[in-house]
Amino acid sequence: EYYKVDALASGALSLVTFLLATPFQVAYIIPSTKESVLVEGAIPAGLMGSQGLFVAMIIALISTELYRFIVQKKIIIKMPETVPPAVTRSFAALVPGFIVVTVIWILRLIIENTSFGSIHNIVGQILQEPLSVLGASLWGAIIAVILVHVLWSCGIHGATIVGGVMSPVWLSLMDQNRVAFQAGQDVPNTITAQFFDLWIYMGGSGAT
């Protein structure tokens, strides 16, 4: 909506490209032989949760920006003015949508032929794992809160800026706790989104 393009088409395209970038393969262990086999055509549930959060955000940004660029360059199917607006919007999204899907598909094929194997592995190794290590530590939490207040002192909404980067990390850590709890194990993370909501952000940033 900010870019004055079809928000519904852009949102749907973000979902489609995320699924396209996700490898539809799951490892299955045969109970009788304990042998692990790769099953094709199955949605990996793990990548639909915290593991796929960063990938979903990055793919959504890429697909939206690419869609916006193509639409604003008028690379679309133009319909006569007598055609209803809903039909016009549908046809206008066809060419940009096809181009975006093709770009993401080619990107996936290229990455699958590297040592990484998938976009999820790249994001996990380069971005998510380092941020998770930082975000899960006490010093990381302290630095994040201090940075929030430094930004506020400059007249910038610090919670929004820092939260935009770190919230996916803390939500991911919270989801790891959920998985461990459901499995009857000790929860591994103290610093999570709930930790900030209960002990730091009550009444405002820094317990104001």
Residue ranges and their predicted role:
Residues M79-R89:
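Cytosolic juxtamembrane amphipathic/interface segments immediately preceding
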Residues E1-I70, I76, F91-T208:
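Pore-lining transmembrane helices
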